[in-house]
């Protein structure tokens, strides 16, 4: 896979829960847009800190080219901050709403933070990742900020 979407848990206490699924129309649009640019896309929804850390580690092992990371409730978790420092590829931090915190500014190879656009934040983050990978131009007529 070329692009991995990692979605963190809603809470990081004894009551952790995975994030709600992306709406099918949003997920379908993401997969279509990535495919249009010659990339593949996979989504990993994580219900715990351990699952997020494992997904980040595997992203390096699998040779992922870019990650869209929604840390959920883990933005202040030191293990997550350390794990993103170890990513061998760029990532875009994604948040559905503006009231979620962000990872520290100098955390790893972060390209941008996209927040406050609901599920649309993922589409905007994907465009940023595709631009960084040099494959934003394709037969799809989608341009963000250009």
Where are these regions (language model features)?
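Short beta->alpha junction loops
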Residues: 40-51
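Mid-chain, well-packed structural core segment of small domains
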Residues: 64-102
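Short catalytic helix/loop segments, enriched in acidic residues and glycine
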Residues: 18-36
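Short, well-structured alpha-helical segments in soluble
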Residues: 53-63
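Short, structured coil segments at secondary-structure junctions
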Residues: 37, 87, 106-109
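Short acidic active-site motifs
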Residues: 51-55, 76-79
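Short beta-strand segments enriched in small/hydrophobic residues
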Residues: 1-16
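Short, glycine-/small-residue-rich phosphate/pyrophosphate-handling segment
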Residues: 21-22, 100-146
């Amino acid at each position: 896979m070329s692009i991995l979407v990692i979605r963190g848990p809603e809470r990081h206490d004894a009551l952790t829960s995975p994030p709600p699924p992306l709406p099918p129309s949003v997920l379908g649009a993401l997969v279509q847009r990535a495919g249009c640019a010659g990339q593949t896309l996979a989504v990993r929804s994580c219900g715990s800190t351990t699952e997020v850390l494992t997904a980040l580690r595997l992203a390096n092992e699998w040779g992922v080219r870019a990650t869209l990371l929604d840390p959920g409730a883990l933005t202040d978790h030191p293990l997550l901050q350390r794990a993103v420092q170890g990513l061998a590829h760029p990532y875009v931090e994604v948040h559905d709403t503006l009231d979620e915190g962000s990872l520290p500014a100098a955390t790893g190879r972060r390209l941008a933070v996209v927040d406050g656009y609901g599920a649309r934040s993922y589409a905007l983050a994907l465009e940023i990742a595709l631009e960084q990978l040099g494959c934003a131009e394709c037969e799809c007529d989608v341009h963000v900020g250009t």
